[in-house]
Amino acid sequence: MSVAVIIDLPNGNEQRYEQVIATVFPEDKLPEGWLVHIAGPIEGGWRVVNVVPSQEEFETFANDRLRPAFEQAGEPDIVPQFTFFPVYKLIQTGTERS
């Protein structure tokens, strides 16, 4: 079953997000099996929501790619907070929205 991952980034912003995302998703290409990546501002930071094949797969991605990307971007004050939940239903139109 797919899993949704909510990532809250206190003190995050669009510029910091773009720095990190350029490293982890070259050419805006999601890893195989990922269904959704959504990002935007929230009060006090930035929020990212992903729908991924499993929590374990995401945790491997976070350890191997995401954390090193934060370090490379020089963002030690941003500590991601992860929340996971199983996806019961996902409805998509198949079009990009922003």
Model segments located where?
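Short S/T/G/P-rich N-terminal loop/turn motif that feeds into the first structured element of a domain
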Residues: 1-49, 53-68, 75-98
